[in-house]
Every structure is written in C-alpha cells, then in structure tokens.
Amino acid sequence: WAAETAQGWDAVSALQRAKSTIRVIIVPKTATQKAAASTLVKVLSTLTLRPGTLAVAGAHTLIEPTKYRNASSVLGRGELPLSNLVYLGLYENDGETGAYTAGLDQFGHPEIEIVGSARGPEAVYQFLENLVQYVIDTGSKLRDGDELQISPTESVGIKFSKGVALPSVKTVKVSY
C-alpha cells in the first residue's frame, strides 16, 4: 500500500517503471533508535542523488527523492525528519476527522490514533504531528488511562485498544 499512500505525486507510475531496488537496514547495536534513524535518513538521502532513483520507501509510503532530501535537511539542526520516518494518515468519516501513525513502533512506541474528532483535518494533523515529535524527542510513553495536558485549560484522555485505521495492532487512542 506504500504507493497508494504517497502524497503529491504519481508514486504508482514510478513503481511501475522501477527496474531494481536497494534495501538499507540500520541495526542499532549500541546506538539509540533516534541515532539509528538519523543514520538511515543520511544514507537514504545520499542514495537519492543517484541517477534514476525514482522513490524512497519510508514512513510506510513512497516518497519522491527530492522531497525526501529536502525533509532530511532538518538533520543539520539536530532534528529528525518526521515525514521520512513516520507516516501520518488522515481521513474523514461522517463529518469527523481521524488520524493515525504508521512507523512509530520503530521507535519503541505503539502507534497512535485520533478517532472521531470534531476538529478539522488541519488541526488534527498538526496535533498528531506535534504529539509524535514530542514522544520521539522525549521518549515519553503514553499509557492507558492517562490524561495528557495539552494546554492550561485542556487535557485529552488516552486509551490503549485495538486499532481502528490499523485493525491488526493495538494502538494508543488520543481523544482530541
């Protein structure tokens, strides 16, 4: 499903033109998951410079090489390019917005879902992106039954249960 989730370009066509693939795996023996992810992004960014590179399979989707490289530029500031590592899916159903992660498990965290939010897609996406960045940066664990204080006047509940967008795994549901 990686080609079908690609955003802003015809990844299916690129995949059909592909004649070969290169698989890169970083196995952290002593490095942290964040350090291993940083190394992986650096290697893949370099490989996108090769002539004929059509796509990078990352974050559970196919990413256009230039877009992958551009997102990787945040490594110079000591940040991880979230869009290259964790896919943020967004959907609408009966006037409600939902969102989910795919790839957060690679950092030792369960996938996160927001289900049935009355907020708009942009607000839900931005909240999920900020939450994922926070979880990866701090290593904080979201636990069943916890409340997450998101502003001085607002908190959201956390529940761990079978996934909605990802039914094959248990996910953390955040009631945003």
Place the predicted regions along the sequence by residue.
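Internal, hydrophobic cores of structured domains that mediate oligomerization or house catalytic pockets
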Residues: 1-87
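Aromatic/basic-lined ligand-recognition segments
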Residues: 62-176
